[in-house]
Amino acid sequence: CHFWIGLCLALAPAGAWVAISADTTGWESILGVESNTWIGRDFAWFPELFFISMGVALWITAFDVNYARMDVEVDRRQGIRSFPATFGLKMTKGLSIALTLGWSICFLFAGLSGHTNVRDYNYPLWIPSVILMGIVNLYVMTSQASKSESSSLDMEKFQQLLFKTSMMTGWVLLASLSFTEGMID
């Protein structure tokens, strides 16, 4: 369930890209092919869009897995097999770390995969933004998650911090791209 939500939301960047690029490239934007021959195919959406979509999938999955920590006992009573209810909080913490490292790496690769000199401007803002938000998310999902297990009030504080951190991640990354695009124009 957690991975499904992440994958569904990962379609948003791909859908936006198709909507924008279909005006200029037509069916090639959907097929992802820049040439009409099978020899020497270039996928227009790879690697930048691929890494952005994968990053979104892992980022949202990491958030949702941690958000499910709040309902572990209810999930177990009702037979819902969320990741934390099925595998426990220790495995949830390990998965959260792996997912956060995964989305950070995907977003870093997206920033490093530019095809033109114009995209080289992503380095000054995109890479530090990804690293900063990856570190902040890791901090929340590790040290703050451990503190949340003592009481329901602590769990509520953790959930609020988790939500704000995850939301802020999106805004910081969007702002770094917007500022970069503004510098280019």
Q: Where are the predicted features?
A:
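Multi-pass alpha-helical membrane architecture of UbiA-family
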Residues: 1-185
